[in-house]
Amino acid sequence: MQRITITIEDDLLAEIDAAAAARGYQNRSEIIRDLARAGLQQTSEDTAQTGPCVAGLVYVYDHAARDLSKRLVQEFHGHHDLALATLHVHLDDNNCMEMTALRGAADEVRHFADHIIAERGVRYGRVVMIPTGEGKPAKARKHGHRHE
């Protein structure tokens, strides 16, 4: 076993300590090891998905973080073929939440989402991927009435 040093925000450490106490962990190392294992297991399950998918990417970030907004915009423009729409919400003076609908090959969607979530200044991120099968994207079709 190796000893490492990590930096954790105060509020996140408080959550870890509360979870450790609630679950009966003897020390921080034990709960952090278990949380890391659970995260790695989830990542393994998520990356196993292949083929076309749709996804919801949700992340919270500090809009004042150095050049983060600019980097995010550049990433989205670089992957405009994946992003269908984005909703931007101001949570407080410092934090914004964005929810983006994505569509594309699962590996490309996963890579893009992972990159956004890993950006410095992104505080929380999650992607939910749903397989769509091998069909073509839906197109408008005639259905018996008109839309004005």
Swiss-Prot record:
It comes from the Bacteria. It holds the Pfam family RHH_1. Ni(2+) binds at residues 77, 88, 90, 96. Its cofactor is Ni(2+). Binds 1 nickel ion per subunit. SUPFAM superfamilies: ACT-like, Ribbon-helix-helix. GO terms for molecular function: DNA binding; DNA-binding transcription factor activity; nickel cation binding. One of its GO terms (biological process) is regulation of DNA-templated transcription. Keywords: DNA-binding, Metal-binding, Nickel, Transcription, Transcription regulation. Transcriptional regulator. Belongs to the transcriptional regulatory CopG/NikR family. PANTHER family: NICKEL-RESPONSIVE REGULATOR (PTHR34719:SF2). This is Putative nickel-responsive regulator. It comes from Bradyrhizobium diazoefficiens (strain JCM 10833 / BCRC 13528 / IAM 13628 / NBRC 14792 / USDA 110).
